[in-house]
Amino acid sequence: YKAHQKLVNPANKRRLDIIVVGTGLAGASAAASLGEMGFRVFNFCIQDSPRRAHSIAAQGGINAAKNYQNDGDSVYRLFYDTVKGGDYRAREANVYRLAEVSNAIIDQCVAQGVPFAREYGGLLDNRSFGGAQVSRTFYAKGQTGQQLLLGAYSALSRQVNVGTVKLFTPVSHTHLRAHETVLDLV
């Protein structure tokens, strides 16, 4: 029953409280996105500040198969480059899924306010980076990790101010009730 039930769906907005552990790039983005969808989200930060995540160290850029330069880029080519770059040790199903959603990830980052580099025409600029066959790396002038983290954190802060996300820092963890019940963990 639970294996086939889609927990994150509009019918469960009022029934489920979602707990997100971590306020790095993945945690802050997940909490902000779920808050924007209308879920009640409890976000636990294990650092002193949500902006102290190690995601800031990612500086090169993000690869996505947007094919802006009409050079034949595709989901399959991104998949192949990623698997080859990992010396064929990556789980191929996960890499393919990541390649499929790469365009949506870039669009989500732009919607969160990440200032990616742009061409004069207004399109997002991309460059060749690493061993990629085509130019597909979207970047923010050598500060990609910092800008991604600030974009996710600002989206999280907006949802905290709206009230859909409740943020718990290490100081506030002691105020939690001792007898909370977790129904399911995703």
Descriptions of predicted regions:
Residues 175-178, 182-186:
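Single conserved hydrophobic/aromatic residue that forms the stacking wall/gate
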Residues 5, 46-177:
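Conserved N-terminal/central alpha/beta ligand/cofactor-binding core
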Residues 1-18:
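Extreme N-terminal leader/targeting segments of oxidoreductases
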Residues 30-31, 53-54, 185:
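Short glycine-/acidic-enriched loop or helix-start segments at secondary-structure transitions
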Residues 18-43:
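N-terminal Rossmann-like FAD-binding beta1-loop-alpha1 element of flavoenzymes
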Residues 11, 23-24, 183:
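Catalytic-site beta-strand/loop segments enriched in glycine and acidic/polar residues
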Residues 13-16, 37-40, 59, 161-164:
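Short coil/turn connectors at secondary-structure junctions
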